[in-house]
C-alpha cells in the first residue's frame, strides 16, 4: 500500500509539470523568421497608408454634407420668409378683387409689406388670446318674456361628461348621473349656459345629447375664453350679465381665476355611476336662488377655500338643521311649561264671574 501510494504521488507530480509546460508553450507565440516579420510590417504600413486618405475623406464627408444641409435650410428659410411677407403684406381686397386702402399705403413698399405682415400676425394672436366678443351673450329678455334671475355657467368635460376609451368602441363620453334632475330643478331659477374649453366641433353634438329637452339657453366654446398662462379662462365680465348673479361651475379653479368668488370648483368626475354630486349641486344652487341672494359672491366666498364646497355645504346644512330642531324642542318645552303654569294659576285663583 505504501509503495502504490508513492507511485501515485510521483505520477500526479509528473502530470502537473507536463500540463504547466504545455500551457506555457500555448501562451507564447511561435517564433517568426526575420523576413516573415518584415513582410508583415510592410503590409501593415501599406495598409495604414492606404487607409489614411480614406479615413480622412470619410471624416470630411459628414462635415461637407452638414454644410450643404445648412445652406439648404438657410435658403428655404429665407424663401419662406419672403413668401410670407409677400402673401400677408399685400392690401386686403374686396369682393370685386379691388385693393382696400389702409394706413400703410403712404409707406415705402418694403415697409408696407412688413407692417401689414406684423399686423396680421398680431391680430391673429389677439384672436386666439382674447374672447371673440366683449359681449358673448345677447341682452337679457324683457317682459312679456321670462328671464331667470340668475345665470349658471357649466363646464362640459369633467362636470357633466367623462371621456372614456375602449378597444371595442374607441372614444365615447359618459353622462354623469343627475343631469336631468339638475336641469329640471334649476331651469326656472337659472339661465343655464354651457361654457366649455372644448371646440365647437366637439362640444356641439355632445350638448345635444345631454339636453334633448332644450333646458340650455346658450352655448359658448373655446374661442370665447381668454387664454392666460396656458389655461382657457372664462371671463364673467364678457357675459353681458350682472356678475352678482352669475355662478360658474368648473373642475378647474383656473377657469374662473379672474372672478374667483363667482365659481364653484368640483372634483373632476371619474366616471363612477354612483356619483351624486350633481344632485348636491342642484340642492346648493336651489337654496341660493330660493333665498333670493342679492350677490352670490357673498355666499360663494365662504366656500372658495374649501377642497369640496358641496360637502362643506352639506355639513353646514346638517348643523343648521340640528340647531333648528334643538331650538324648536326648547321652544316646545317652554311653551308646555307656560301652559302648565297658566292652567295651575287659573285653578288656584279662579276669576270671579261678572254679575
Swiss-Prot record:
The signal peptide, as residue positions, is none
Give the top-rank taxon of the lineage listed in the UniProt record for this protein: Eukaryota
Report the SUPFAM superfamilies cross-referenced here. HAD-like
The entry's localization annotation reads: Mitochondrion inner membrane
The way it spans or sits in the membrane comes to:
Single-pass membrane protein
Q: Give the range of the organelle targeting sequence.
A: 1-44
Q: Which residues cross the membrane?
A: 68-88
Protein name (database record): Mitochondrial import inner membrane translocase subunit TIM50
Q: Which organism is it from?
A: Bos taurus (Bovine)
Name the gene for this chain: TIMM50
Amino acid at each position: 500500500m505504501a509503495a502504490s501510494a508513492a507511485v501515485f504521488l510521483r505520477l500526479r507530480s509528473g502530470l502537473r509539470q507536463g500540463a504547466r509546460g504545455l500551457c506555457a508553450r500555448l501562451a507564447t507565440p511561435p517564433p517568426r523568421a526575420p523576413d516573415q516579420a518584415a513582410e508583415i510590417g510592410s503590409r501593415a504600413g501599406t495598409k495604414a497608408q492606404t487607409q489614411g486618405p480614406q479615413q480622412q475623406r470619410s471624416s470630411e464627408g459628414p462635415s461637407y454634407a452638414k454644410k450643404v444641409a445648412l445652406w439648404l435650410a438657410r435658403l428655404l428659410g429665407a424663401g419662406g420668409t419672403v413668401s410670407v411677407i409677400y402673401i400677408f403684406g399685400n392690401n386686403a381686397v374686396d369682393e370685386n378683387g379691388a385693393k382696400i386702402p389702409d394706413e400703410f399705403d403712404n409707406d415705402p413698399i418694403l415697409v408696407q409689406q412688413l407692417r401689414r405682415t406684423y399686423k396680421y400676425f398680431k391680430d391673429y394672436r389677439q384672436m386666439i388670446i382674447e374672447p371673440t366678443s366683449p359681449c358673448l351673450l345677447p341682452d337679457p329678455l324683457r317682459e312679456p318674456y321670462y328671464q331667470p334671475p340668475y345665470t349658471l355657467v357649466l363646464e362640459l368635460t369633467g362636470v357633466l361628461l367623462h371621456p372614456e376609451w375602449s378597444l371595442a368602441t374607441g372614444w365615447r363620453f359618459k353622462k354623469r348621473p343627475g343631469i336631468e334632475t339638475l336641469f329640471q330643478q334649476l331651469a326656472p331659477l337659472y339661465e343655464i349656459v354651457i361654457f366649455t374649453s372644448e371646440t365647437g366641433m366637439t362640444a356641439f353634438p355632445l350638448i345635444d345629447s345631454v339636453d334633448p329637452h332644450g333646458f340650455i339657453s346658450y352655448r359658448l366654446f373655446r374661442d370665447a375664453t381668454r387664454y392666460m398662462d396656458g389655461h382657457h379662462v372664462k371671463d364673467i365680465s364678457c357675459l353681458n350679465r350682472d356678475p352678482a348673479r352669475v355662478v360658474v361651475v368648473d373642475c378647474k379653479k383656473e377657469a374662473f381665476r379672474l372672478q374667483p368668488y363667482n365659481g364653484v370648483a368640483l372634483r373632476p368626475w371619474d366616471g363612477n355611476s354612483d356619483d351624486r354630486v350633481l344632485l348636491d349641486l342642484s340642492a346648493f344652487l336651489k337654496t341660493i336662488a330660493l333665498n333670493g341672494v342679492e350677490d352670490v359672491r357673498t355666499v360663494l366666498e365662504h366656500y372658495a377655500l374649501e377642497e369640496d364646497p358641496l360637502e362643506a355645504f352639506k355639513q353646514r346644512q346638517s348643523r343648521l338643521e340640528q340647531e333648528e330642531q334643538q331650538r324648536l324642542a326648547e321652544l316646545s318645552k317652554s311653551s308646555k311649561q307656560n301652559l302648565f303654569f297658566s292652567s295651575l294659576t287659573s285653578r288656584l285663583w279662579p276669576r270671579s264671574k261678572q254679575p
